[in-house]
């Protein structure tokens, strides 16, 4: 008698990891509030646009340091303890903002926020990857992506309440600490400790040039948006409510981007998907250029701006995997793409801050125009991967290497 093997179920996996998902959703809310409110607070403090760019870029510098050091921490202390420690550090970093207004002090705290937040995400995504079978991993990660956009959107809605700085930090800390409760109260079996590994930086530019260029561009576009979009809206004469609406609409565009380009790229290839996304974002950028005084048009344009750019990293990763002859090299390529994205994310706020200081609100748009034109032209001269050699597209933010 043949015994049928039970097929893995995404619903069952999500249910098993429900405490993890609830916790990270609450942390996404806190992070959305902390990240998007920075530009507004620094503007109120009288900080120049250049220094706002420098301070906010420290968040992404912390993310780079997390990619280097957090994995070995998880290998030593396990998932549950690492999650608790990094969540506590995240909450402490948010709390300390109320104790001083020094630029250097804020830059240091932003660094700690970035390090702790990305370390939390590394714990969660590594856990999800370990517990999800290959057949259902993309669907479990898609659910996780929905939580990210939903949580970040709630944080942005809270920002619209126009609260004082103290209340914003208090609410964000509340959600961050609340996010630590499910993991510490529900009995959940954590995965075995990951093996320790040496840090290595592979050299694969000759193999996946479009993927590396795409991930670098994604880093600049996404970090510039999250760090400087609030400053941009203020420069155009908008209010805190306008900032909230602007970012919330952008998040909807980003979510729909993941859904659309997954199917499109599987049918027509990553190169044409990257070019289409860049073209849509470029058209939106030019419309923004000529309508800087009209916030309603800007809110429509930002939907298409993020629709075209928020999937660039996932498309770049899919492109890289399509180009590989030896699939065992995918880990090294993933590390290279993450490094490329991280460098872009560090440079994005710095460049955008300088451009806004020089050109005003137009500077925000010019950064997108220049970098997107470069990527579009570069992509046009790259080869197309045949359909039979393409892998499955997985919606993925460039938060961490998933091992």
What is each model feature region?
Residues 10-60, 208-214, 222-239, 243, ...:
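Helix-loop boundary and gating motifs at the non-cytosolic
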Residues 327-357:
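A late C-terminal transmembrane helix in Major Facilitator Superfamily
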Residues 81-95, 272-287, 369:
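Structural signature of the two symmetry-related core transmembrane helices
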Residues 168-185, 365-380:
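Symmetry-related core transmembrane helices of the 12-TM Major Facilitator Superfamily/SLC fold
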């Amino acid at each position: 008698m043949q015994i049928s093997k039970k097929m893995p179920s995404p619903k069952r996996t999500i249910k098993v990891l429900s405490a993890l998902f609830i916790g990270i959703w609450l942390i996404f809310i806190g992070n959305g509030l902390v990240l998007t409110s920075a530009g507004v607070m620094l503007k109120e403090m009288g900080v120049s646009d250049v220094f706002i760019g420098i301070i906010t870029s420290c968040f992404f510098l912390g993310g780079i340091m997390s990619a280097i050091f957090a994995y070995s921490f998880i290998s030593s202390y396990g998932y549950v303890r690492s999650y608790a420690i990094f969540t506590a550090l995240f909450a402490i970093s948010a709390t300390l903002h109320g104790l001083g207004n020094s630029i250097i002090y804020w830059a240091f705290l932003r660094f700690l926020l970035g390090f702790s937040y990305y370390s939390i995400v590394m714990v969660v995504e590594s856990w999800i990857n370990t517990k999800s079978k290959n057949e259902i991993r993309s669907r479990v990660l898609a659910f996780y992506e929905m939580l990210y956009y939903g949580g970040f959107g709630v944080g942005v809605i809270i920002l619209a309440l126009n609260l004082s700085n103290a209340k914003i930090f208090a609410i964000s800390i509340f959600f961050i600490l609340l996010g630590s409760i499910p993991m510490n109260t529900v009995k959940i079996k954590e995965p075995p400790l990951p093996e320790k590994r040496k840090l290595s930086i592979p050299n694969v530019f000759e193999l996946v040039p479009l993927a590396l260029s795409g991930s670098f561009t994604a880093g600049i576009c996404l970090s510039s948006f999250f760090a400087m979009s609030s400053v941009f809206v203020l420069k155009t004469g908008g209010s805190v409510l306008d900032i909230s609406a602007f970012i919330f609409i952008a998040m909807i565009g980003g979510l729909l981007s993941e859904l659309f380009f997954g199917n499109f790229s599987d049918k027509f290839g990553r190169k044409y998907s990257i070019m289409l996304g860049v073209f849509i974002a470029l058209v939106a950028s030019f419309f923004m250029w000529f309508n800087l005084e009209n916030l309603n048009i800007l809110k429509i344009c930002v939907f298409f701006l993020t629709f075209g750019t928020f999937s660039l990293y996932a498309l770049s990763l899919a492109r890289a995997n399509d180009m590989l002859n030896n699939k065992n090299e995918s880990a090294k390529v993933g590390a290279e793409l993450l490094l490329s994205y991280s460098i872009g994310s560090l440079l994005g706020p710095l460049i955008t801050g300088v451009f806004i200081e020089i050109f005003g609100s137009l500077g925000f748009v010019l950064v997108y125009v220049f970098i997107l034109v470069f990527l579009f032209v570069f992509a046009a001269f790259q080869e197309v991967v045949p359909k039979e050699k393409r892998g499955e597209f997985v919606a993925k933010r460039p938060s961490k290497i998933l091992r």
